[in-house]
Amino acid sequence: ETGDCEVGDKYEGMVHINDATIYFPDMGEIVPIKDELLKTSESNDFVFCMFGINPDLKKFSFTDEQKEKMLSFGDTALVVLDSEEFIRRVNIAAKNAGYQAEFNSVNYYNPNIDGGNMLFSLGAGMWNIAFWKRDSYIYQQEVRFVFRPGAENVDHIELDIGDISDITAIISAEKALSAIVQNEAPIEDE
């Protein structure tokens, strides 16, 4: 959490329980839980967040809300032109540094409703908690890497992914936010 509610979120990496009870059979006790944040074994993993455009969309443009809020993130944008190669390079660098890495889109949830989807996704790996965020951040349209350092106790990590100028472009944030992206690739029917 950064203290800036547009950038940091105390709910990140935590399981938010709106209204539930936990039964402790050894003590025969039922404990009510109301609006609590529960840490997980993965609450201190590291994430690298980026804005992502759904590749299945034929056309994309930023909403007025995105334009307004995202200009505060900085004046420059790094556009990844080859996402598959970018992901491959980051995964190789993470593996070489001894970290497990996962990449996925962020799912957004209503914090006033206890939904089963988040808990269900944690069954596939507790690290999936990094891909859940309150719906007040949906405008960020994030994709993320989560890096799992294992037992290592560090406050940050740095990865050398090498020169990426062949798969990226640097443009002004204003230009990026006013762009209209058109997908010329044929989209397969399911």
Task: Locate each region found by the language model.
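NAD-dependent ADP-ribosyltransferases
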Residues: 1-190
